[in-house]
Amino acid sequence: KKLGASATIVLIGENAPYCEENVLKCLNTAKPICEKENVTLIIEPLNDIDRKNYSMPYAKPVFELLKKVNSPNIKMLYDIYHQNMMGDFDIGEVKENIDLIGHFHVADSPGRHEPGAGNVDYVNILKEIGKTDYNGYIGLEYRATKNDGETFGFLKEADLL
């Protein structure tokens, strides 16, 4: 709040006994603070291939936690790269839970390079997200293999530029 930020991204951390229970307790503690201060807490599930022993690498359990917390100020950062690496990317699940998503990250996989360098169909994914009422940010978080301007072609194809 003091920084003037309307949202902050946090990680869940390493896997530990009772992790899900502890995360739920922490989110419920944060809920009234976030709502009072009108700040959004955004949780990012990371794949446990790149980040060994990461707790809750799949989107579905995080969506379930967010439904239990039931706050418009606590959401998920849906990183398509991480979910694809886990073999768990599902555009239907994204669309069903779009109200629980506060931010997207984009990187192709494997390799975490620009869209079009791997196996993720970002043009169609972004078009599908565009059909929802999502109005948040989509962060481009990749290691470019081309000049920056050349890596934005997928945005034009998805009618985002």
Please identify what each model-predicted range represents:
Residues 1-25, 35-36, 135, 142-145:
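Structural motif corresponding to the early beta-alpha repeats
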Residues 4, 28-29, 40, 56-78, ...:
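Histidine-acidic metal/acid-base catalytic patches
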Residues 9-17, 43-53:
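Active-site-proximal beta-alpha loop/turn segments in soluble metabolic enzymes
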Residues 16-23, 52-55, 115-118:
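Flexible, glycine- and charge-enriched loops at secondary-structure boundaries
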Residues 23-43, 48-51, 144:
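N-terminal/domain-start segments enriched in small and hydrophobic, helix-friendly residues
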